[in-house]
Amino acid sequence: MATKKEETFYELYRRTSLGICLTDALDDLITNDRINPQLAMKILANFDRVVAETLQEKVKARLQFKGALDNYRFCDDVWTFVIKNINFKLDGGNQTIQADKVKIVSCNAKRPGTDA
């Protein structure tokens, strides 16, 4: 009998606008006894998987950015950069987007716990 190995994905995208809205909606459903917490965890795990796969397969756009590196750190195979006075420029576009401060979190492209 074959057993299916559970794949794990980074939970980074739960901190995006969409992830926060999903988490809030699930919390409301749990509070109102509409779903149980185990189902909410399965939904969030599915969200993590789908967002990671979609970004990897569908998004091909590139951008350039330039700014002043304020601080950086490397912990548990995750790089974190805080950049101030940053300018973004999308490929093929003449428009520049500016921000006072941006936090970039970079993880290994390999799935956690795998060598692939």
From Swiss-Prot:
Domain of life the protein comes from: Eukaryota
Transferase listed as a keyword: no
Location of the protein in the cell: Nucleus
GO molecular function: RNA polymerase II core promoter sequence-specific DNA binding; TBP-class protein binding
GO CC, alphabetical: transcription factor TFIIA complex
InterPro entries (UniProt xref): TFIIA_a-hlx (IPR009083), TFIIA_b-brl (IPR009088), TFIIA_gsu (IPR003194), TFIIA_gsu_C (IPR015871), TFIIA_gsu_N (IPR015872)
Keyword terms, alphabetized: Nucleus, Transcription, Transcription regulation
GO biological process terms held by the UniProt record: positive regulation of transcription initiation by RNA polymerase II; RNA polymerase II preinitiation complex assembly
Family that this chain belongs to: Belongs to the TFIIA subunit 2 family.
Subunit architecture: TFIIA is a heterodimer composed of the large TOA1 and the small TOA2 subunits.
Primary role: TFIIA is a component of the transcription machinery of RNA polymerase II and plays an important role in transcriptional activation. TFIIA in a complex with tbp mediates transcriptional activity.
Protein name: Transcription initiation factor IIA subunit 2
